[in-house]
Amino acid sequence: MCGDQSDHVLQHWTVDISIDEHEGLTRAKARLRWREKELVGVGLARLNPADRNVPEIGDELSVARALSDLGKRMLKVSTHDIEAVTHQPARLLY
């Protein structure tokens, strides 16, 4: 029966995000740990000298880029895992 609680599995994965800023460069790291593996995505944002300094925008942009990088890295892991199981080339789209 579809929706039966006996076939329902709930998992929680947590991404830890750290942000540091130095001399107009903001760097974010998005770290995911699961199944004894760890992936880290990195994102950078640089303050344009002509722009007003609004640190929150640099934080948002660097975090968005770090999460995007993490997603791409996760797809590479998934591709490798699929190929290991199927023994066929896999191509996953982002």
Swiss-Prot record:
Pfam families: Rv2632c-like (PF08962). InterPro entries: Rv2632c-like, Rv2632c-like_sf. It comes from the Bacteria. It comes from Mycobacterium tuberculosis (strain ATCC 25618 / H37Rv). This is Uncharacterized protein Rv1738. One of its GO terms (cellular component) is cytosol. Transmembrane segments: none annotated. Induction: A member of the dormancy regulon. Induced in response to reduced oxygen tension (hypoxia), low levels of nitric oxide (NO) and carbon monoxide (CO). It is hoped that this regulon will give insight into the latent, or dormant phase of infection. Induced in C57BL/6 mouse lungs 3 weeks after low dose aerosol infection with H37Rv bacteria. Was identified as a high-confidence drug target. Signal peptide: none annotated. To M.tuberculosis Rv2632c.
